[in-house]
From Swiss-Prot:
UniProt cross-references to SMART domains, sorted A to Z: Ribosomal_S4, S4
Keyword NADP: no
UniProt cross-references to InterPro entries, sorted A to Z: Ribosomal_uS4, Ribosomal_uS4_bac-type, Ribosomal_uS4_CS, Ribosomal_uS4_N, S4_RNA-bd, S4_RNA-bd_sf
Highest classification ranks of the organism: Bacteria, Bacillati, Cyanobacteriota, Cyanophyceae, Synechococcales
Record GO cellular component, one term: small ribosomal subunit
Function statement: One of the primary rRNA binding proteins, it binds directly to 16S rRNA where it nucleates assembly of the body of the 30S subunit.
Stated family: Belongs to the universal ribosomal protein uS4 family.
Subunit structure: Part of the 30S ribosomal subunit. Contacts protein S5. The interaction surface between S4 and S5 is involved in control of translational fidelity.
Gene Ontology biological process: ribosomal small subunit biogenesis; translation
Name recorded for this polypeptide: Small ribosomal subunit protein uS4
Amino acid sequence: MSRYRGPRLRIVRRLGELPGLSRKSPRRAYPPGQHGQARRKRSEYAIRLEEKQKLRLNYGITEKQLVRYVKKARRATGSTGQALLELLEMRLDNTVFRLGMAGTIPGARQLVCHGHITVNGQVVDIPSYQCRPGDIVSVRDRDRSRKLVETNMEFPGLANVPSHLEFDKNTFTGKVNSVIDREWVALQINELLVIEYYSRKA
């Protein structure tokens, strides 16, 4: 399954707020479609599927990528759900987004793919690159890159830089100080339901 490239607000109306996908909030509180306002009792499977879709669409990853992240999280010590969120939050595209260099994760991914971002002084154009404590994430030292990020910073996606990151607006440089804490994950998600979804499919 490829990345979603359709109307973002339609997805937000169906799944709820997705801070990584869109800055917009739905004006209507019910899902899109002719029967959007109909209230039907959802099955447990439907609830788990919806949480999985929220996670995948917010971080802009494919189904195949999410399956790989779940497998990797299962091999980690501690909570599998927490490990899954850490893996997704520490991706380079998400880190660029959380530093305020882009208004959405798709916007941050574009910056990375087009070679506007460096990690520890080297251009990294792989959005899935896993940032680690101590990494220095910067805007490439050229006018075009800096102007793009300057414009993006006027309309940041989220108001606050999370506690595991720091950002110098004068030098366009961020630092990863640690792995993100669960309370700083902006997406409202029950990650255990996502793990259950894949456990039951296995």
